[in-house]
Amino acid sequence: MIMTESTVAYPTRPSNWTFWAAGALGILATAVAAILPVLVGVWQKQAGLQVDQAGFVAATELFAQVAGTGMFLWASPRWTLRTIAVAGLCVMVVGNIATAGSVDFASLMVARGIGGAGGGVIRALCMMSLAKALSPGRAFAVYAGAQVGLAAVTTAFIPHFIETQGVRAPFLVLTLASALGFALCPLLPRHSPLPPSAIRQRGPASYPMAAILAIVALCVFFAGQGALWTYLAPIGAYRSIPAAGVTQALTLLNFAGLAGALGVGAMAHRVNPRIALLTLLATEIISIVGLFRVHSPVGFIASAGAFYFSWCASFPFQFTVISQSDSSGRASAVVPAADGLGLAGGAALASVVLPTLGLGSAGWICAAASVAGITLYIWSATLSKMPARSMQRVAAVDSATLEG
């Protein structure tokens, strides 16, 4: 029997309860990010912040989550998943309590920096755990579907909740939810999340080339999505779509995303990721063309829905490629940081070129980045298959030698 590193380090696959617990903690960690667009407006109106100050607070949250991913990568060779989860939840609780008690711009920045760092730790833990599922793509599809559903519900519910209970109320609720998250920690493994060889080898050089390509692909792909996603409403106005039609499109997007993540993404374990990624890329390119060609609200809604559908349906297949590129799960842990940086970078790039090249440049950036990202994914998937084929050839030679 050929014992791989995976079988030596993890003689038994983690139980299903481990994946459900990690997924639930990951959803909890994304709660603030899901309502950031609403919170920016609330901080501006009720907390007396300027528009740029509210934006800085939101950016602090996102970049703190990236820092949290780095903290998880540092802690994963040293601590168990349970210990890391408890530490991350403690930081989240402190950040949410501090946010509820914030009195000015500076204190709010510090509070969201703390809370975001804790959320980044938990999200990275969630991604590494899902990567070790029997079907990482299907596990991620369920997680992504829950994330989209949370965004839809909270976006609709939070404005009224804040209006009646005050701007501090959501963070008090999140504090309670984070405290309840401690009950899920015993379901996580008591061993280190990394195999022995991954603990000995640290630093960027220890990542397989396939994993590096996959992470770069994720960042590039999400930069394209961020460049277009951020400016969907202005694009609708540019195409003379009534404001009601644009609002309806942005509302229905969540249903399209949910259908993509759960419907198509749930088949990630049955479909070749490379074929699925190419098919969904073609769908996205067609939807981008439609966004800049339609003249009716129905056409705009259909194009925007197809764009978000293909994006959300593609992500589980992308996660499958990432999880296959690195059996230790470290590459998967970087996913929250890479997609967050990609979204922020894409939106920033579009904001620079739009005044000169017009709104159409957002579509070109999205299309070019999507093509480049999927190309890198296919390259990564091809490299990931090569060691497996080499192993099969070695096993065949050994078998022939024994028989001879």
Regions found by a protein language model. Name each.
Residues 36-37, 210-251, 255-258:
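Extracytoplasmic gate region of multi-pass secondary transporters
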Residues 48, 101-106, 272, 293-295:
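Helix-breaking motifs and short loop linkers at transmembrane-helix boundaries and internal kinks
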Residues 67-104:
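Conserved MFS/SLC helix-loop-helix module at the cytosolic interface between two early adjacent transmembrane helices
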Residues 68-81, 260-273, 354-355:
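Helix-to-loop junctions at the C-terminal end of transmembrane segments
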Residues 120-134, 312-326:
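Intracellular juxtamembrane helix-capping segments at the cytosolic ends
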Residues 133, 142-190:
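Helix-loop-helix hairpin linking two adjacent transmembrane segments in secondary transporters
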Residues 272-318:
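C-terminal transmembrane helical hairpin of 12-TM major facilitator-type secondary transporters
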Residues 325-359, 366:
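A late C-terminal transmembrane helix in Major Facilitator Superfamily
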